[in-house]
A protein has these predicted regions:
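Short active-site-adjacent helix-start/loop capping segments
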Residues: 34, 69-73, 99
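Short, charged beta->alpha transition segments
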Residues: 44-53, 99-100
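Non-catalytic interface/targeting segments
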Residues: 1-46, 105-118
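Alpha-helix C-cap/termination motif
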Residues: 54-55, 106
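Mid-chain, well-packed structural core segment of small domains
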Residues: 55-91
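Short acidic loop-to-helix transition motifs that present clustered carboxylates
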Residues: 93-98
């Protein structure tokens, strides 16, 4: 079942009718809550291991960089995604939620990794 994002505000998100208050990774069929990054506001390859090893592989990864956009990506993340043919979109989380829903509804395999605060 596809998991559309119903709403987002600083520190909270509703996905498929369920509310989450920790950072999340959203696959089309499931939500991984409690997503923790090794370096807080810096996204590293190991933070995305479940995305990079997903089967089927996503076509697009949407990264929500936080309410104010403070999360930054390491160059290794961009390279790892490119090597796997995964298109990367980074946006502040509010815009990333809208982008995820739009891409999901278009039928593409999309995953979102969303930081809910900062």
């Amino acid at each position: 079942m596809r998991k559309l994002i119903n709403s987002y505000r600083f520190g909270a998100i509703e996905i498929g009718g369920k509310r989450y208050t920790t950072d999340v990774v959203i696959f089309p069929d499931r939500v991984l809550d409690g997503w923790w990054r090794k370096e807080g506001h810096r996204l590293c390859v190991e933070d995305l291991s479940k995305v990079l090893n997903a089967d089927p592989r996503p076509e697009v990864l949407v990264v929500g960089t936080g309410y104010s956009g403070l999360v930054k990506l390491s160059g290794e993340v961009e390279e790892a995604l490119k090597d796997r043919g995964i298109r990367l979109i980074t946006q502040p989380t509010k815009e990333a939620c809208q982008t995820f829903n739009r891409i999901l509804e278009s039928g593409q395999r999309v995953v979102a990794a969303l930081h809910l605060t900062c």
